[in-house]
């Protein structure tokens, strides 16, 4: 029977399936951080259990950490408590920790792939909703709750219902100035934040095969904003080349053997999906969010919708509520809206390729006098590689702040926050009410668009800096 990529990986990991029961999956990889792991470790201690496979768990500090300094004392009291607790727990249970000052510390969904901890065909979980990122490697990756984190620690298994499958085929090529971030924002804008609910989605097509691993991770990262639990891309030579030589990756002849197996991780010809979507990506323009959920997105040259554009009363109310919060009007042109802060980073767009794209636009320019711009590498490895290329000098000379690794302004959980009423051009993944600080306003966009906004001080078209 022909199978999809998702079905192949899922079925290969079923260790038990009782009658009228959910299948039990073996979990190959477990990523943890300081926010969702403390209660799980406490549960193990109360039950006097050890971890089943501490060697298959990797911990990092990312959500709470200050990006202004690698000194623990730079963090808030709550952050210090969570970070210290993770340090103690990982030491007690024998889990490797990428702590403050570690050359590999960074955002969980960036350090996993760059260390080769994420591999094609594995099951990978984390107490974080954006775990779907790792599906870019052909891994079955999804976010779990704290009780499930404890269960994986104790048993290395999870009960999981099998999801429906959706194929998203991407045809054509991007226009100049359009990136993977624009594609996923466009997809969510067209179909809504609930379209993927109950599905494992697979991105495929001629465009996907040409994308870098960084771009593929951006797509799978925001599968969750599309409503899906899982986003996957079949591995190929681009995947294998990315993995080769990384710390946790197979080595030598073993690597070649794995590559042969990984080549089988693609949907069979004739495999049936529960739903399919086909996109012509050549029509996509730089995308900007205008509201308070990731489906409220328009092209840079478009106007904010009017209430008459929606027939559904709940959608009409959502529009009015969003515009009231972000202080914008129906039928308003998005280009030219004043911004206060630019944030380039996060598990969506904090990789080296993202920083290169931003640097190419910022080079030779100064940011607007009324703008504060934070450039936050997603890991200390990304930071080092960027500095080796001189990107830090470009950012600093432009007037940006060059930070240490962490989640930073993606969420108002650390010391990088926007004040009430401040408008942020952000490369993160969520624009919810107060996401980047109480009363803050978020506009999601690509690193190229964010860099252009930093120069002009308003939402603008990045293509003018690319000769388009």
Swiss-Prot record:
Signal peptide: none annotated. [4Fe-4S] cluster binds at residues 347, 407, 410. It catalyses: (2R,3S)-3-isopropylmalate = (2S)-2-isopropylmalate. Binds 1 [4Fe-4S] cluster per subunit. This is 3-isopropylmalate dehydratase large subunit. Its cofactor is [4Fe-4S] cluster. It comes from the Bacteria. Belongs to the aconitase/IPM isomerase family. LeuC type 1 subfamily. Catalyzes the isomerization between 2-isopropylmalate and 3-isopropylmalate, via the formation of 2-isopropylmaleate. Keywords: 4Fe-4S, Amino-acid biosynthesis, Branched-chain amino acid biosynthesis, Iron, Iron-sulfur, Leucine biosynthesis, Lyase, Metal-binding. Pfam families: Aconitase (PF00330). It is an enzyme of class 4 (lyase). Pathway: Amino-acid biosynthesis; L-leucine biosynthesis; L-leucine from 3-methyl-2-oxobutanoate: step 2/4. It comes from Campylobacter jejuni subsp. jejuni serotype O:6 (strain 81116 / NCTC 11828). GO terms for molecular function: 3-isopropylmalate dehydratase activity; 4 iron, 4 sulfur cluster binding; metal ion binding. CDD domains: IPMI (cd01583). Coiled coil: none annotated. The gene is leuC. Heterodimer of LeuC and LeuD. InterPro entries: 3-IsopropMal_deHydase_lsu, Acnase/IPM_dHydase_lsu_aba_1/3, Acoase/IPM_deHydtase_lsu_aba, Aconitase_4Fe-4S_BS, Aconitase_4Fe-4S_dom, IPM_dehydratase_rel_enz, IPMI_cat. PROSITE patterns: ACONITASE_1, ACONITASE_2. GO terms for biological process: L-leucine biosynthetic process.
């Amino acid at each position: 029977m022909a199978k999809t990529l998702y079905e192949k990986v899922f079925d290969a990991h079923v260790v038990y399936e009782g009658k009228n029961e959910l299948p039990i999956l073996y979990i190959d990889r477990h990523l943890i951080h300081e926010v969702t792991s403390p209660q799980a470790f406490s549960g193990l201690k109360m039950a006097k259990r050890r971890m089943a496979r501490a060697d298959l768990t990797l911990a990092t500090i990312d959500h709470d950490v200050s990006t202004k300094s690698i000194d623990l004392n730079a963090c808030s009291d709550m952050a210090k408590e969570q970070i210290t607790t993770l340090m103690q727990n990982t030491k007690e249970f024998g889990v490797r920790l990428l702590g403050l000052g570690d050359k590999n510390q960074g955002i969980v969904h960036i350090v996993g792939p760059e260390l080769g901890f994420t591999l094609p065909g594995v099951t990978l979980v984390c107490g974080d909703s954006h775990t779907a990122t790792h599906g870019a490697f052909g891994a079955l990756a999804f976010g779990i709750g704290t009780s499930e984190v404890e269960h994986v620690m104790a048993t290395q298994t999870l009960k999981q219902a099998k999801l429906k499958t959706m194929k998203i085929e991407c045809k054509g090529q991007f226009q100049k100035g359009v990136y993977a971030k624009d594609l996923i924002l466009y997809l969510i804008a067209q179909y809504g934040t609930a379209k993927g609910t109950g599905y494992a989605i697979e991105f495929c097509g001629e465009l996907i095969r040409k994308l870098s691993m960084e771009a593929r991770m951006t797509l799978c990262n925001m599968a969750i904003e599309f409503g899906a639990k899982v986003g996957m891309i079949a591995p190929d030579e681009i995947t294998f080349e990315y993995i080769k030589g990384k710390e946790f990756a197979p080595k030598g002849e073993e690597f070649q053997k794995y590559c042969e197996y990984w080549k089988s991780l693609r949907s069979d010809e004739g495999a049936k999906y529960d739903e399919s979507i086909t996109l012509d990506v050549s029509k996509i323009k730089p995308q900007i969010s205008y509201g308070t959920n990731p489906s409220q997105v328009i092209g840079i040259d478009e106007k904010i919708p009017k209430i008459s554009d929606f027939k559904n009363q709940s959608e009409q109310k959502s529009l009015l509520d969003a515009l009231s919060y972000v202080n914008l009007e129906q039928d308003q042109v998005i280009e030219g809206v004043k911004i206060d802060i630019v944030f380039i980073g996060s598990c969506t767009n904090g990789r080296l390729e993202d920083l290169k794209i931003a640097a190419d636009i910022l080079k030779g320019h100064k940011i607007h006098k009324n703008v504060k711009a934070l450039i936050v590498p997603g890991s200390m490895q990304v930071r080092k590689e960027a500095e080796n290329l001189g990107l830090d000098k470009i950012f600093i000379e432009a007037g940006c702040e060059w930070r240490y690794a962490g989640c930073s302004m993606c969420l108002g959980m650390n010391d990088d926050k926007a004040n009430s009423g401040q408008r942020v051009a952000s490369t993160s993944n969520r624009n919810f009410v107060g996401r980047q600080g109480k009363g803050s306003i978020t506009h999601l966009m690509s690193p190229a668009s964010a860099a252009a906004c930093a120069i002009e001080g308003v939402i603008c078209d990045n293509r003018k800096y690319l000769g388009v």
